[in-house]
Amino acid sequence: MSDKWKDYVLMLIDLQSAFYPEGTQAAFPELPANVERVVATCRTEGIDIIHIRSRFRKDKSDWMPKYKKGNSIPCIEGSEGIKVLPFAKELRGEPVLYKQTFDAFLLPDTAELIQKINKRLVIIAGLVTKTCVFHATLSSSQLFPTGIVEDCCASPNDHEESLQRLDAYVVGRTRSDTILKDCERWREHIMNS
């Protein structure tokens, strides 16, 4: 494995059962194969992976106000919804961070980890495009050049619209079968950051 991709990191967001229900599965049936492909490519080529997951306490002490009011939240500890989708499980040594917010970058650990492991370009994939992926991508783009793997994201509503809204902030979109070509193209953004 070379260090050609040493400046890149793939961030997988909320690839958990609660965020891939039957309706989303029907609308995005290729998501599992696409995520498997991009994860395998990154692991083979030496692009580090960070896993970001939602996790909330049963006692509601860390629930966002919107959910406290509605008395319901996905990804409660011990629930079915918190389970990691089989195609997105971490390998030993791949960091996993847990969040109680839409935006992974509201956790100080997220940016600190990316800086600590000397990454200069963030590639984002995950669920749900219009919420957690959207918020994390916006925040990431303020700190690092950021790309998004469009066929490794899904949202029951507003998927394409969310991606279009992010176009102004990202270095570009990629797909699971073109990620290396696009990472090469994005290298200029690392040099200029």
Where in the sequence are the language-model features?
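Active-site-adjacent betaalpha module
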Residues: M1-V9, R37-A40, T44-E45, N71-S193
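A short alpha/beta connector and helix-capping loop motif
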Residues: K6, T24-R55
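Acidic-leg catalytic submotif of subtilisin-like serine proteases
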Residues: V9-L15
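Active-site loop/turn elements of alpha/beta-hydrolase fold enzymes
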Residues: L15, S54, D151
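Short acidic, Gly/Ser-rich segments with clustered Asp/Glu that frequently serve as metal-coordination loops
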Residues: Q16-P21
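Short glycine-enriched, charge-decorated loop/helix-capping segments at active-site entrances
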Residues: G23-P29, K68-P74
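Early exported N-terminus immediately downstream of N-terminal targeting peptides
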Residues: G46-I49, R53-N71
